Curated annotation (Swiss-Prot):
Entry-linked Gene3D superfamilies: 1.10.150.130, Intergrase catalytic core (1.10.443.10)
Signal sequence annotation: none
Residues of the Core-binding (CB) domain: 1-85
Alphabetic keyword roster: Cell cycle, Cell division, Chromosome partition, Cytoplasm, DNA integration, DNA recombination, DNA-binding
InterPro entries with a match to the protein in the record: CB (IPR044068), DNA_brk_join_enz (IPR011010), Integrase-like_cat_sf (IPR013762), Integrase_catalytic (IPR002104), Integrase_recombinase_N (IPR010998), Integrase_SAM-like_N (IPR004107), Recomb_XerD (IPR011932), Tyrosine_recombinase_XerC/XerD (IPR023009)
Organism: Roseiflexus sp. (strain RS-1)
NCBIfam families: PRK00283.1 (NF001399), recomb_XerA_Arch (NF040815), recomb_XerD (TIGR02225)
Residue span(s) of domain Tyr recombinase: 106-291
Protein name per Swiss-Prot or TrEMBL: Tyrosine recombinase XerC
Active site: 147, 171, 243, 246, 269, 278 (o-(3'-phospho-dna)-tyrosine intermediate)
Length: 313
């Protein structure tokens, strides 16, 4: 049974060009499902029945998995059996009459503009090479709304400080070129001109990565998460996740009057409905101040002047 799971995962990588993190999530979901049906004495995938699928969903609910997790597990199983059916490995699809569970969709959590300002000022209170790097990363995240996975994948050649743009590669290899504001450009210039070379001394060979760790290697998502956790503790915040900066960018842009379609392109969303969820968040503390924030006004000005560079095909 594991051989067919591996074949499916290779299909996701080679044919559908899914990201490594997405494939890892599929593996986790299918490993749990495989353990479940094996415990029910199913030795071949053709032995799995409609009742097995329903029992798996009940199993997840009884263990109080979040509705989003149940929905993801079921979606992974449905995709897997569609693959098996299409390849002729099973005669019928036991998930065919299974409805995807409804997901209780929580609104994204965003920081207020005041909290963003405090976060962006924290690194320079003790300007070490690492914290100057942190300043550049945080400014860039808030200025562009890019994902952390996109941030840590940036190379030196992706930054164009002359034209104030950054080129990032998103999900499914989609490339977009984003404008950056003056605050982010200044922070990046300071980092690239001074701090990066100090961090690079820890590396045995030249490296293209834009953001380096203290050993001179490319900073990882996990490394960034630990950095952000440190700043959250310094601010006294109960929780601060990397994605909250992306949420904050979107909410503050829309509250300041930015066009929904422009924000969709900046975020790299394929569907406008994904971006629309941010219109339901309107912090009383962020509706007005964001208009007078130099950082936010500058970004919003880029949008209003239609300086957004279209996503490359």
């Amino acid at each position: 049974m594991n051989d067919q799971v591996e074949a499916f995962l290779r299909h996701l990588a080679d044919e559908r060009n899914l990201a490594a993190n997405t494939i890892a999530a599929y593996r986790t979901d299918l490993d749990q499902f495989c353990d479940f049906v094996s415990a029910r004495n199913r030795r071949e995938w053709r032995d799995v029945s409609h009742d097995d699928i329903l029992s798996f969903m009940l199993y997840l609910r009884e263990r109080r998995y979040a509705s989003s997790t149940v929905a993801r597990r079921v979606a992974a199983v449905k995709s897997f059996f569609a693959f098996l059916t299409g390849s002729g490995a099973v005669p019928h699809d036991p998930t065919e009459r299974i409805d995807s569970p409804k997901v209780d969709r929580d609104l994204p959590r965003a920081l207020t503009p005041h909290q963003v300002d405090e976060l962006l000022e924290l690194p320079l209170r003790s300007p070490t090479p690492e914290r100057i790097r942190d300043k550049a990363m945080l400014e860039l995240l808030y200025a562009t709304g890019m994902r952390v996975s996109e941030l840590v994948a940036l190379n030196m050649t992706d930054i164009d400080l002359v034209h104030s743009t950054v080129r990032c590669t998103g999900k499914n290899g989609r490339v977009r070129v984003l404008p950056i504001n003056g605050s982010a450009a200044t922070a990046l210039e300071e980092y690239c001109d001074n701090s990066r070379s100090q961090l690079a001394r820890g590396s045995d060979a030249p490296i293209d990565a834009l953001f380096l760790n203290h050993r001179g290697k490319r900073l990882t998502r996990q490394g960034f998460w630990l950095i952000l956790k440190q700043y959250a503790e310094e601010m006294g915040l109960g929780e601060l996740t990397p994605h909250m900066l992306r949420h904050s960018f979107a909410v503050h842009m829309l509250n300041a009057g930015a066009d929904l379609r422009a924000v969709q392109e900046l975020l790299g969303h394929t569907s406008i409905s994904t971006t629309q969820i941010y219109t339901h968040i309107n912090h009383a503390s962020s509706a007005q101040p964001v208009r007078s924030e130099p950082r936010a006004t500058e970004v919003n000005g880029v949008i209003n002047e239609q300086a957004l560079v279209p996503e490359e095909k």
